[in-house]
Amino acid sequence: MNCPCCSNKLYAECCEPYHTKEKYAPTAEALMRSRFSAFAIPNGDYLMNTTLPAKRKFHTKEELQEWGEINQWIKLEIVNVPTMNQVEFKAYYIDQDQNEQLHHE
């Protein structure tokens, strides 16, 4: 299976090792790709575990899992990687009302 993060790699060779805790994402880009894949699969455990502790109070693991399930995750575009600890990205998805959405950070 191709990895949902749009890396053109197989899931088993890309984001799956992060999702199974075999490896930890070494860069902000790898972390972002793994989180996008976790929404697409979905994997609420991984999403909660990789959410900043200060932000965990805003969502439950179940809510993250559901958000992954109710949306169709189309594409992740890496816009800029200024440093290993920063990434600018665009996540494209279709929401539960069939509206195209773009999340840009």
Q: Where do the language-model regions lie?
A:
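Short Cys/His-rich micro-motifs in 6-15 aa windows
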Residues: 17-25
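Short Cys/His-rich zinc-binding micro-motifs
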Residues: 1-9
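Short beta-strand edge/turn micro-motifs at domain boundaries
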Residues: 103-105
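Short, aromatic-enriched amphipathic alpha-helices that serve as compact interaction elements
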Residues: 26-40
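Cysteine-centered loop/knuckle micro-motif
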Residues: 13-15
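Short solvent-exposed beta->alpha transition segments
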Residues: 49-78
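Surface-exposed, charged secondary-structure patches
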Residues: 67-98
